[in-house]
From Swiss-Prot:
Belongs to the poxviridae K5 protein family. Disulfide bonds: none annotated. It comes from the Viruses. It comes from Vaccinia virus (strain Copenhagen). InterPro entries: AB_hydrolase_fold, Hydrolase_4, MAG_DAG_Lipase. This is Protein K5.
Amino acid sequence: MGATISILASYDNPNLFTAMILMSPLVNADAVSRLNLLAAKLMGTITPNAPVGKLCPESVSRDMDKVYKYQYDPLINHEKIKAGFASQVLKATNKVRKIISKINTPRLSYSREQTMRLVMFQVHIISCNMQIVIEK
């Protein structure tokens, strides 16, 4: 959620950041069907405190040691996600997908799918253009 909030803040206040490095931005909700999106919005409005789902610990990291620590960390909320929260996350994600091309703040995005390879991001640092390609 941090990257999503940063993107929304950058859109609302274009001069807020000089540049952004976004870790795992939540901008791809293609896996969610339209019916599920509609159901989430409806449930989020009618029954915002209803439990709707739980975060799969294996989605937190591929490092099983970290997954184990996550599962047994007493400071982490292991309850189900509430409908109101899920609805707001989907709403924010949908907005980000619509506005991301309008944001001029230089950004480097890094997601789990790109662990082995980051391809062709332009990062502008003090009027110096750099192209970053990292390959293993």
